[in-house]
């Protein structure tokens, strides 16, 4: 809400996000130290305006954009396997299954943290998908693309997300699975779609009840 009351320039958005993430990072680090534990979490966030998408990422949760013709992975996994792939020591397929794909280069709550910011044009018609690594491990990009484009209604889109989470579970995925989706038919349809996005998140974010998340978050902040 504070961000929405400011001048929505790219610089202001990224400064505000960086401040927020740094504060959260320090609180998580302090919580872990005070309780004698190690913890860390990833974050991928997107802000949609009438003509732009603004993104920030720490870790390996992904953001995809379906632009009406193709599915684009907007974020890059911040993992040791991807680092090795970029150095030419692993192929893309090897990086996908390599055990180092689960080794994060950075996260919130542990070590050094430097968010990656970017922005891109928002297409007239399209969709955004945010997914944790538990979702992206089990589904191909072709399956994700179909999931975003085949449903014709909000209810069908929500059903596809629920089916995707169930499929990942049945395939043996034990990591956290969180999926959020937002689709729009034109740039004027953003407000109502945002409400549906929140509803989908509430249904699919993990296994614990929402009040349990609120309680644990309250212990930290």
Cite the ranges covered by each PLM segment:
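PP2C/PPM-type serine/threonine phosphatase catalytic domain
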Residues: 1-221
């Amino acid at each position: 809400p504070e961000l929405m009351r400011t001048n929505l320039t790219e610089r202001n958005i990224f400064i505000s996000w960086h401040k927020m993430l740094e504060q959260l990072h320090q609180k998580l680090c302090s919580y872990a130290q005070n309780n004698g534990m190690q913890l860390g979490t990833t974050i991928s966030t997107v802000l949609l305006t009438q003509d732009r998408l603004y993104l920030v990422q720490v870790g390996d949760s992904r953001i995809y954009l379906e632009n009406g013709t193709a599915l684009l992975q907007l974020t890059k996994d911040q993992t040791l396997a991807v680092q090795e792939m970029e150095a030419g020591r692993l192929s893309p397929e090897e990086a996908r299954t390599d055990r180092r794909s689960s080794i994060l280069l950075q996260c919130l709550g542990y070590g050094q943290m430097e968010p990656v910011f970017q922005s891109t044009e928002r297409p007239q018609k399209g969709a955004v998908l945010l997914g944790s690594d538990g979702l992206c491990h089990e589904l191909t990009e072709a399956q994700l693309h179909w999931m975003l484009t085949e449903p014709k209604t909000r209810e069908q889109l929500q059903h596809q997300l629920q089916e995707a989470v169930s499929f990942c579970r049945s395939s043996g995925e034990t990591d956290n699975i969180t999926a959020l989706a937002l689709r729009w038919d034109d740039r004027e349809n953003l407000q109502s779609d945002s409400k549906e996005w929140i509803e989908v998140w509430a249904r699919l974010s993990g296994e614990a009840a929402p009040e349990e998340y609120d309680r644990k978050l309250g212990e930290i902040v």
